[in-house]
């Protein structure tokens, strides 16, 4: 291109064969969605029982709390994030010393 404006002579088109990875995908494939019962069964298979040991959230208590949860891998990761974040578990004795709402 010479100059500030593009002319038709400056445009070069190159035609080549379409590569297989660029071919369009048929969105009307013959897949079937599972019914609700099958979906629920698949969710039940993914659940595992986990044993969680966490310290009491009170600063003066050294009690280790043990709870068991039935969760998916995603669910247990979310629970772990809560426990390492703002959520703290309390033992029954420390819970009795606290008032509802933390006041």
Curated annotation (Swiss-Prot):
Classification via Pfam families: E7
Superkingdom: Viruses
Segments of this protein annotated with the region E7 terminal domain: 1-45
A cellular-component GO term for this protein: host cell nucleus
MF annotations from Gene Ontology: DNA binding; DNA-binding transcription factor activity; protein domain specific binding; zinc ion binding
One example of a Gene Ontology biological process annotation: symbiont-mediated suppression of host type I interferon-mediated signaling pathway
Zinc fingers (unnamed) by residue: 56-94
Alphabetized InterPro entries for the sequence: Papilloma_E7 (IPR000148)
Localization in the cell: Host cytoplasm; Host nucleus
Motif LXCXE motif per UniProt: ranges: 27-31
Keyword check for DNA-binding: yes
Record family assignment: Belongs to the papillomaviridae E7 protein family.
Domain-level remarks: The E7 terminal domain is an intrinsically disordered domain, whose flexibility and conformational transitions confer target adaptability to the oncoprotein. It allows adaptation to a variety of protein targets and exposes the PEST degradation sequence that regulates its turnover in the cell.
Function: Plays a role in viral genome replication by driving entry of quiescent cells into the cell cycle. Stimulation of progression from G1 to S phase allows the virus to efficiently use the cellular DNA replicating machinery to achieve viral genome replication. E7 protein has both transforming and trans-activating activities. Induces the disassembly of the E2F1 transcription factor from RB1, with subsequent transcriptional activation of E2F1-regulated S-phase genes. Interferes with host histone deacetylation mediated by HDAC1 and HDAC2, leading to transcription activation.
HAMAP family the UniProt entry points to: PPV_E7 (MF_04004)
Annotated protein name in UniProt: Protein E7
Organism: Human papillomavirus 47
Taxonomic lineage: Viruses, Monodnaviria, Shotokuvirae, Cossaviricota, Papovaviricetes
UniProt gene name: E7
